[in-house]
Amino acid sequence: MANPPAPARNVSRWTPEGLLGPIVDEKRLETELLEGDLAHRPDHPLNLRLAFYAPSTPGRLGRAIRRGDGRLAVIGALKRFTPAAYDDARGLSDGRWSSAAGNMDDGRRGPPPQTGRLLSSLDDIGRDGRRLAAAGVSALAVHVDERRYGTDISDLAAVVKAVAGTSAEPGPPVVAADVVVHPLQIAAAAEAGATAVTIVAGAALPDLESLLNTATLLGLEGVVEAASDLEVAYALDVGATALYLTDVDRSTGRLRPGAGVALRRGVPEWVTTIAGGGFTTAGDAWAAADAGFDAVMLGEVLLRNRRLEGYVAEVTGRERDVSRRFFEAMGYDGRDDPAAKAGARRL
């Protein structure tokens, strides 16, 4: 049998590591300033969101990406650039582009802008969202961390509006991707019309349970981004039902190919799982599918792809191979089998 995640330990003294530390400090400052502004504005939309809970959490994201045909779903991630710190960690340093400083509250001063590698100008981000939806993605994600990705909460609202569809035929669910440290960020995502919100475990482990509860109370699905066995174990311990298991180590910015697949092995089948982080080929996605993932989140490879529909069709057109997981469940992972190694290289 596959080994379950190790029991979650006490995380009350846990602090964000590496690159995540300054990001968390920045997010806390932003939300602290915003909270001060809203203290005397009880009728502000964000205060009203937090005061009046949603009657239910529809669960549209989970239904959209847990396909019943044995094929992988694709979540298309929209962002204007990739963080400079990630490129630096991977030996990439050219093609820099600077974002404007800003945060959740229009007109508020923000920290100095960072630079990053331009992926797409996204001059009409709503149109780009419709383009991804037409290409066959099952859901969309919009990064709302403007300082690192060049997209913000207004871009999220624009995409939600552009792909809304009708009550009879709703468009794809839209996920707000952010480093969440405060309920106000979740309220902002809900106010913009998001279906779900990502919560980076490495940035908010001691507060993870309360943030997930806030998402549920506001009618959003909470997707926990986890990059270690501890983060996976703790997320499951506090009730997470959707995990984004990424190959990117946010504390260093480095890629760790296969890390998400390794983390997936002990996750129960009833948990919705999303893979991603530096995927470039259909083979990367197929390996995730064979490992049992429900979906893959793709950003740069979609935004810069000249054969978008064909690529999405290639990723989603192959049924998952369950034989690998069967043998893993029997205690054999095939790592010492030359034939298995050759098959892995062909991917």
Q: Where are the predicted features?
A:
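An N-cap/entry alpha-helix motif that binds or orients negatively charged groups
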Residues: A2-S120
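C-terminal helical cap(s) of enzyme catalytic domains, especially alpha/beta-barrels
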Residues: P257-G266, A289, L302-L347
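Ligand-binding grooves and catalytic loops that recognize ribose/phosphate and carbohydrate rings
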Residues: E221, Y234-A242, V248, P257-G266
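N-terminal active-site wall of soluble small-molecule enzyme domains
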Residues: F81-V223, D229-Y234, G260-L263
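Short, well-ordered coil/turn segments that N-cap beta-strands
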Residues: D69-V74, G136-S138, P170-P173, A194-T195, ...
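Catalytic cores of alpha/beta
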Residues: V181-G193, A227-G239, E269-L298
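Glycine-rich phosphate-binding active-site loops on the catalytic face of alpha/beta enzymes
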Residues: V142-V144, A188-D207, Y244-R254, A291-V312
